[in-house]
Amino acid sequence: MDERKLKYDIGVITPYKAQKDLLTSRLQVKKKYKAYSIDIGTVDSFQGSDRDIIIYDCVRAAQQNRKAKIDFIADEKRLNVSLSRAKKLLIIVGDMKFLYQAQCSDANNPFVRIIECINKNKESYEIVEMGGRNAR
């Protein structure tokens, strides 16, 4: 297949502006990504638009046994925007264990349902564990 015909619009969604700015600056210096149509934005900036491929960067991760609340990223309306913008492929980047165990003010952590759905439907979804600074 001709690789030139495999051009996809890619969106990277993150809840926080500071993370958006960091990702934007990192991708701008990588010349190998200039051939791709990549838009990086916050959840709010993707409201009403979609892309072939969406990468949702949850940002949050465990920090030395600290019980963190994830209310901002767990807001169901914002999460709905983040997870419903992909036409062909959705990639969620995050610390799965942390997101599963994190607390929300209303005791309703939507990531529990998302992760359980992924685990129950392994023929449709894939979890890839990657090393990193917070990997255990």
Name these PLM-found stretches.
Residues 9-11, 28-42:
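Conserved RecA-like helicase motor-core motifs
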Residues 27, 63-136:
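Helicase C-terminal subdomain and adjacent C-terminal extension
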Residues 1-25:
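Conserved helicase/translocase motor-coupling segment
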Residues 41, 45-61, 81, 89-93:
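A short beta-strand element within the Helicase C-terminal
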Residues 17, 21, 25, 41, ...:
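Feature representing long, continuous alpha-helical segments
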Residues 1, 43-46, 68-71:
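Short, contiguous acidic/charged loop-to-helix segments that flank catalytic cores in large enzymes
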